[in-house]
Every structure is written in structure tokens, then in C-alpha cells.
Amino acid sequence: MRPMRIFLNDDRHVMAKHSVVYPTQEELEAVQNMVSHTERALKAVSDWIDQQEKDSGIEQENPEPEETETTEEGKDSEAKTGENPTRTLRGVMRVGLVAKGLLLKGDLDLELVLLCRDKPTISLLKRVADNLVLQFETVSEDKYEVVQNIREASIVIKNTKEPPLTLHIRLTSPLVREEVEKLSAGETLTVSDPPDVLDRHKCLAALASLRHAKWFQARANGLKSCVIVIRVLRDLCTRVPTWEPLRGWPLELLCEKAIGTANRPMGAGEALRRVLECLSSGILMPDGPGLYDPCEKDASDALEHLERQQREDITQSAQHALRLAAFGQLHKVLGMDPLPTKMPKKTKIEIPIIDYTVQIPPSTTYAMPALKRPIEEDGEDKSPSKKKKKIQKKDEKSEPPQAMNALMRLNQLKPGLQYKLISQTGPVHAPIFTMSVEVDDKTFEASGPSKKTAKLHVAVKVLQDMGLPTGIDEKEESVDESEEKPVLQTPSQTADSEQADSSAGDQSESGKQQGPILTRHGKNPVMELNEKRRGLKYELISETGGSHDKRFIMEVEVDGVKFQGNGSNKKVAKAYAALSALEKLFPDYTTYTEAPKKKRPPMMPRGGPKFAGKHNQGFGMMYNEVPPPQVMRGRGRGGMNRGRGRGRGGFGGGNYGGYMNSGGYGGGYGGNNYQTSATAGYSQFYSNGGASGNAGGGGAGSGGYSSYYQGEGYNAPTPPKPFVKKPPPPQQQQQPPPQHASNPPKPSYNQGYQGHQGGQQQQQPQQQQQQTYNQNQYSNYGPPQKQKGGYNQGTQGAASAGSYNYSNSYTGGTACRVRQWRGCRRARRPALTQRQALVTTQGRTPAMVQPAVPHRTKVTHSRTTIKVPPDRTTAALQIITSPLREEQEVMAGIQITT
């Protein structure tokens, strides 16, 4: 499994640090020589002691009660050693760094454990040490110094050359632990110990180190990256004093626990980060879970020797190291310089692969005991799927390595050949490359769907010319030929079948490079067979080959006949099986044509009753509850759905209420309202409490709501203006209504730019007309024109903060005039729905005006009913209705009701 990509940089740093701290080959050879020489010398000492005992006829007494009362653990330990229990020295075992393979550069202390039949004594230690000096002279030419350390119950051996190594041989016996267990169980000992017996605690520690070595070899050595991480952390414990108390057995247990509980193999960088996460979680803290020692019968904490302050310091240091690793600064934790992001390309140098797990080969002097009992495989526990996977793995291992292809063979025979691209033909999706190579003054050319395939075909030609094997698998060719035989059986299409057979043979040779497998009709065989026979099932018959070159055989049953196909994947195998079935069962089938599809009815306009058309109803800020009727598509600016002039529609176009009902945000494209003020579009909702001096905000005759809440007021809808290339005739100036002296007119936020109007836009005391972009913004950027009196430019004399803003109304002394568009064009006048507009009387009392709907084809002057609340006095009101070109003003009669 590939390591996770996010930890690749950490993996590089950890492996670089590991290569620095890993001992050199010379150091490992020196350790190997010293350990092997000592083991051979101890074997000779054991033989010498045995021979002396046999010659003298004196054997050490083994009391019968002691033999009969040995515990099961003692019997197991004797069985594990595999040595003769009658020998005084039963065997020597490697422990510590040597057995676990955790040696670092500069580690000079080595350990061995010498197992004795009885409890080791001082006399036995001296006897072994004295004879060991003599045996070293016969075993090796190297000089070794032997020192007796009775206090530590060990023999110390030192070499006399570089590097200066020190080897400790610790004497112990399984009887020491058996005696301790008896005492803890409350039993009395019937046999007294010799007076010169060695320290019991030292012997127990030697036995524990032996158990630790066996456990480590069984559990930690098999974990990926575990040994590497332990070596790196051992170096960290040496460099950082805070981590020093964790060095040794607790560190090994911790790393095995953190890495062994992962659900997948991890790289070195990810494994190190997982160990840091485990430490940062507080496993060392006094109230934490602790670290169980698996090599002890009684439950014991392997961290009991750590003090509280040491636990906190290590946890804090691990948390800091984890932060550095998270921010890409793992090199600071490892004590190294950061590596470059991109390594320079170097020529490959053959370097012998180093096995980082096993540093020193096992001993050949003594037969090493079995690390664990053999696994008892029970048929009930093993699932069939696991057995199948194991069988497949065994088959993959037993398969011979794949042979070289033609290109590899040719490169070995003729290194340094230059392949040239001659031409590239064919369409973009299926190119054909032609490559050439010159070998021995001969030029060979071949084609293929890719440059790599073309080079391979060229190599095949060269090898065939040289009379050498090309590396093509003949077995695959024979299988593919047998699959293509049904094509040859059709007598009516002999020539076509021969061509198909040759093309199929080419496809079988290089199926991966030839693209999809198709029938003679250019269809996928599986799809075409499914058109003939529905519900076919393809079964996987076999799966062979390694992970890099698998072969699948699929089978399909059609009309009681089974057809097989093979390929590099299941899809290709299914295609070949279907192709074989088609050629066998349907040799003369005609081209399949699909039935004409039924024409579907036209789609209804999107939306429900609330949104009758695509763009006839805006739904951004607010909308009408009753949808207006759908109108024919307009041709001018701001049409219903689309327009062909400037400003085509937008959201809601100009006929109905979209965003602000003037086409787009704040009078956008539909009504040509490119407003530039800070309150454009939404100013009528928020600026000045809903009342501004001008009826701006929504645009010229804007159909947007003039107040924030729906239903409190509505402006008369504005049909779009026709697109006319020549400038329109000047409009008649309208007399503004009289103003109150106490309320001067206020400037509008939406009056637009007036910089190009020249001197024709002078302010008049009696009439302050303010032109906005809402009537025709394009005229402002042309040459100076005559000022036009547009709609939505009057002022409100009676408006004040908090009152309503009526964008199309003029308020005056006792009368109020409402301007209303009558039509859009002469020939086509869009229908106006019945609306309700607000007008004001002299006392600023809201009254509802209900104009009648004008007809589409002719101008009518209808009556308008104004409803005034009964508690207010009524007054005669005049409504001035004007057509598009304002040729005349028509006065309509009004009826006032209470």
C-alpha cells in the first residue's frame, strides 16, 4: 500500500534521519564478530564443564522435590530453550539491542544471557570466566579482555580494537523466578540456596530481558516502520534530556501499541506522528490509561518508574513536537536541516538493499528457540474468503517472473538505439504514430496507436529480422485465435472474416493499446448482444497472473451455449465473450437501428400558478400574489421575455414586476435604468424612511413597489418604449403643480448625471425639473439636446419623512393628477391589467384609484372611480391620461364615492 501523500515529506525526513543514526557496515560487522566469537567460546566452555563432570563422576545434585515441584512456566521455559536440561550451562541467548535490531551509531554496549541449570553462583561465574579466556584464544585471533562483575551477576568482555565494544554476559536461571512465585503464593521452600548465590534481582532482570526480546521479535519486528520509528525516537531520547526516562522497554511498548493498533500499514513519517499523538493524548499522565506490560503475569505498569514531573514534561514535549510536525517543521523535532522540496535527478547507482529490520544474522552456534508456538489452524475459525486469498497469493508467488518484451530485449542487445517519429496520422481521438529505428545500417518502421506501441512493433520487426525470440506470448495468441474462429465459419463473408480475424489477432496481442473493442457496426459487443438477448449474466471463471499482469476469463451463456473471453480486465474479457457469441449465433445479423423516438409535447412554462411565465414574474424581493397574464414577446427594449433592442428584458423585463419592475437590479437592462446613486434600485425601500423628494428609485414609471410592504402602494406599470433610431420629438412641457411654501422641493437620489446638457439644464425658481436615467440615459452622453420633460421628475410638495412615496403622482392644493401610459406602439399595445394606485388629497389622505383596463387596439377614455374614506371630505380630482407621444391630453370624468 502506498503511503499517504500528505506524509511523503515527513517520510523523507524520517528516513533521512534514520540513515544518519543507523550504524555503519563496519560497526555492524564488528558487533557480529564479537557476538559470534563469544557464543562459540561459551559453547566450548559448556562442553569443557560437561566433560569435567563426566570424568570426575561428580554431578551436581538435583533434589527430587525441586524437580517434581517445578511449575508449568518452568517446564515451558525448558522446552523453549531446546537445550539438554542436564547440562550445567543450558544455552546463551541474545537480548537487548542486539536481539531487537535497535542498534544505533555509537551504541557500544551489547548483552547476552547465559542460562544455567541451577541458580548461578559466584564460583560458577569465576569458573566460566577463567575458562573463557582460554577458549577465546582457540576460537579467534582477536584479543578480548574478560572481567568478572559479581555485583551485577555478569561477565564483561571488551575488545582491544576499534570500535571499543563492551559485551555483558548475564547469568540467570528459570529456578530464580519459580522460587519467587512460590514465595508470593505463600509456599515454604524446602531447599536452601547455596551461600554464594548471585543477586536474585539481577537474575530476574536478565530473565525479563529474555522475555522482552522474544516478545519484540514476535510483535514489533513484523510491523512496518515500527523498528525505524523506535530507532529515531531512541536518538531523540539521547539528544533531549526530557525524553531520556522513556528510553528502553517503555518506548518499545509505546511504539508497538501506537503503530500496531492502526488499521493499515503506515510509512515512517505517519507512524512517527501517530506515536507523538499517542503521547500527546496523555497516556503517560498519572490519571491516564498507563502502559500495560505484556511480559508479566500480574498486571503491571511499565511506566511506574516515571515521576509525575517527568510524565508531564514528556507529554508537553510530545505536544510541541506534534505541532511542529503539523506545520511542516518535523526536521526541527528530528534535529536536522530541512530537505529540499525537489531532489535533483541523479544517475541510478546500484546500492545493495539494506534490511533495516534485522541488523545481525541469527546465531549458528546454539539453535535458536522458537519465538512463538506454531499457529494452530482450525478450519472452523478460518473463513473461505481468507483461504481463497491465501491460495491466490501462493499462486502469485509460485508464478515465474514475466518475460521481457521485444523492446527490452532489443535494448539489451543493442543499447543506445535512437527511435525517430516519422509521421502522425489519423484523427485526434485515434492517432496513428509511425516510428523508425536504424540497426546495423537497416531501417525498420512500424505503426501503432501510441509512440510506445509503435516502438514495440519496431522492436518486434528487428528481432524477427535477427532471428531472435520476440517475447510474444504464444498461448494468448492461440486463445484469441480460437475465440475468432466462428468468424471464419461464415462462408458468405470470407474476405471480411479474414480481415476481421487479422484485426482481432492484432487486438489480442496488444489489447491495452488498441482502444475499445467494437463490433463490425462500431458498437460495444456487450451492448449489441444485450440488444439481441436481454438479461444475460457474465460470470468470472478464473483470475490468474500477478498484480501487474492479470488475466481474467469471463463466461456468458446465450441460448444454452456458453462463450468465454479473456482479457487484462473483466471489461475486456466480457467484451470478447460477447463478441464470440455474436459471431457464432448471429453471423448474418443486420445493422441495428433504433426506433424513432416519440416526439414529446412542448414543455409548459416553468413554475406554478405563482410564476406563470419564465420571466413574467420576479421573485427576488417581493412579487404579486396574482400572476399577470402572459404577454406576447416584445420587440423593443425591455420586452416581456426577450427583446431585440438595447436592454433585452432582464429580470422581469418592463411589463411586469421583476426586480423593481424596470428590468434588472435597480432599474437594470429592461428599462434602461443604469442608476449610479448609492441608493439605486433599493432607495425607495430604505432611503429617508420610504419617502424621497423625487419619485425615483424604481425608474421612469417604475413598476416596483414604492413602499417596503406589499399592498400599501403600487406604481402604474410602464410599457416599454419603442426602439427608434432618430431622436424622438420633444415632449410637451407639463406645468408643475403648486408647491407649499413651507416644504421646498427636495433633490432626488436618482436624478442621474446632467453634465452633457450644457446651459439648457438651468434651474428655474418656479420649476426645478430633475432628469433621471430612467427616461433615456443614452441622451445624456450625446450632443446637447433640448431638455425634455419626462415622467417621474416632478416633486412632492406635501411629502415628508415617514409618509409614502408615490413615484407617479403629483400632489398639489386640492387636486392630484396621475399620469398613465396608454400604449407601447401604434400597432401593438400590450394589455394593462387592472391595478390599484394610491393618490393623495389635500389633507394627505390615501385614496384608492381603480383605472379601467384600456383595450389593445384603440384608445378609450374610461371613467375612474376614486374611493375616499368616509371620515374625510372629498374633492374633485382630475386624471390626465396621455398616449405615448403626448399628442393631446384627455380629461376623463371621475366619480367620487365614500
Swiss-Prot record:
Residues in the signal sequence: none
Top-level division of the source organism's lineage: Eukaryota
Ranges annotated as biased composition (Low complexity): 749-782
Domain DZF: 5-379
Cytoplasm found in the keyword field: yes
Residue ranges constituting the DRBM domain according to the UniProt record: 399-468, 521-587
Places the protein is found: Nucleus; Cytoplasm
Keywords on record: Antiviral defense, Cytoplasm, Developmental protein, DNA-binding, Methylation, Nucleus, Phosphoprotein, Repeat, RNA-binding, Transcription, Transcription regulation
Pfam families from the UniProt entry: dsrm, DZF_C, DZF_N
CC per GO annotation: cytoplasm; nucleus; precatalytic spliceosome; ribonucleoprotein complex
Chief subcellular location: nucleus
Ranges of biased composition (kind: Polar residues): 489-513
Region (Disordered) residue spans: 52-87, 374-403, 468-529, 627-651, 711-799
Basic and acidic residues bias locations: 72-81, 374-384
UniProt GO MF annotations: double-stranded RNA binding; mRNA 3'-UTR AU-rich region binding; mRNA 5'-UTR binding; sequence-specific DNA binding; single-stranded RNA binding; transcription cis-regulatory region binding
Positions of short motif Bipartite nuclear localization signal: 372-390
Composition bias, Pro residues: 717-747
Description of post-translational modifications: Phosphorylated. Phosphorylation affects nuclear translocation. Methylated by protein arginine N-methyltransferase 1 (prmt1b) in the RGG-rich domain. Methylation decreases DNA-binding and thereby decreases transcription of the gata2 gene, but does not regulate dsRNA binding or subcellular localization.
Function per UniProt: RNA-binding protein that plays an essential role in the biogenesis of circular RNAs (circRNAs) which are produced by back-splicing circularization of pre-mRNAs. Within the nucleus, promotes circRNAs processing by stabilizing the regulatory elements residing in the flanking introns of the circularized exons. Plays thereby a role in the back-splicing of a subset of circRNAs. As a consequence, participates in a wide range of transcriptional and post-transcriptional processes. Binds to poly-U elements and AU-rich elements (AREs) in the 3'-UTR of target mRNAs.
Subunit: A component of a ybx2/frgy2-containing mRNA-ribonucleoprotein (mRNP) complex. Also a component of the CCAAT box transcription factor (CBTF) complex.
Protein name as annotated: Interleukin enhancer-binding factor 3-B
Organism: Xenopus laevis (African clawed frog)
